[in-house]
Amino acid sequence: MRLNDGEVVSLLGPSGCGKTTLLKLASGIEKLQKGEIKLNDKIISSSNTHLSPDKRKVGYVFQDCALFPHLTILQNIFFGMNSKEISAQTNKIQNLMNEINISRLSDSFPHELSGGQQQQVALVRAIASDPKIILLDEPYSNLDSRLKEKIRDQMLHILREHNISALLVTHDPEEAMFMSDKIGVLNNGVVEQFGSPIDLYLRPKSAFIAEFFGEINLFEGSVDGGLVNTVLGTFKCSKKLNKNKVTIVIRNEAIKLYAVNKAMSEIVNENGFIVSPYFGYVMETRLLAGSTLIHLSLKVNQTNYHIHARIPGL
């Protein structure tokens, strides 16, 4: 993986896949056993090289904020900096605190702040030392959904405005897609795919990757030359397949529904869609935020297929 200047890269994956470990290696908290980590093309970690954390110019925002309870907010922000560094960064930090509306909290203590305010302080503290990169370890996991949206939007604007590179750990795909220029999906310590959010969403390399970015439907298919036959219709293959049986992955929002009184040929001619030769039945509908989830039943011979479709609005 490569993180360019000013980019935000997210590490996404299930619990225990190695996301936080990778952050600790990048920060220097843990030592690398194999491979290399470079910062501005200089090796900072390898099997025989280890630059200490204090010399890496890396900011770290922890999941629990890690603010010192006995220090005021301003003391927390400038902790570990000498008088010369504080003098050089004071105007920048004051402007940043004004921008996110926490300057009034300068003399407060961490326990007097809300969870969102503590995260804002943690970000300002990480920026205060003028790092080359900021590492963010699930910074919004303890916030409610509405506050999470507000804080992450605010954080992204700050990173962009100050051209700060960031490496973000999250298990939330929506958060990763919102925040990131690129995403690395980890599984069992291995980066399975690395690319832009749109690449991972539209061109996933596996069903594991596809399912991380939204619920999917799986269908068995039989290969016939350059075609794959399924209960949903016949699909063209983008490459040659050296097997007789495959699995088709289709996202909920890719399934379109039409009333039975509309001719299939009309649907195909209008939209170029692949049309199932079988009729489906609506079993249940559920209104979600901004969309409706529809449970469908498709009966083929003696087999019932349970399918999920998602349509905008009601």
Set out the residue ranges of the language-model regions.
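Conserved coupling/switch loops of ABC nucleotide-binding domains, chiefly the family-specific signature
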Residues: 33-36, 188
